[in-house]
Amino acid sequence: MTHPGFVLLDKPAGDTSFKALFPLKRLFGTRRIGHAGTLDLRASGLIIAAVERATRLLPFIEVADKTYRFKLHLGFETDTLEWDGKLVFQGEAKEITEESLKQILPDFLGEQEQIPPNYSAIKINGVRASDLTHRGRNVTLSSRKIRIDSLVCLGKSSTQLEETGKSFAIFDMECRCSKGTYIRALCRDLGHALGTYGCVSEIRRTAIGNISVENEIGRAH
């Protein structure tokens, strides 16, 4: 008989959160395994998995704040709000410095309304918004209340110049936020606040509440 409990997993980018549980199901010989806090396919980092009766406690874990590290790309925006999506808007970013970015970060702290990305798992009449967007349907998502407790610029990664003469800048960021916060949408909104456009790469969840990914004891394969 499998004993109830929790397992900390480090999900690699490219795997779904559901797929990350497969090794545990084989290891423990049970299908009664769930997880708290779905990560985007392209994101990596901490997932807390619950086994057997421990799954009853997942709702209490899901409401915990989350901490992420990511790269903020300024100067363009894509359909997915990920750096390698289809380009939809392009602006300038060569004048944006680490100091000018830091000046606007306090404006993003606290409770606020955020419009989720169209490429998301939010359902409209039972269908994921991302599926509707793929089909070419016009998707309009309502804003949702979120909370950002901490938003820090860790430094500027680089500035690159396109052949068109347009420039874009990349900053390393860290954010601690409430359940339901989309980092992709945050990067979009940061870009708009700076008079340009924004998207994201390398999202990594480093903590759920006080539990850090550095404490993880398993890696999903």
In which residue ranges do the predicted regions lie?
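Catalytic/RNA-binding core of pseudouridine synthases
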Residues: 1-219
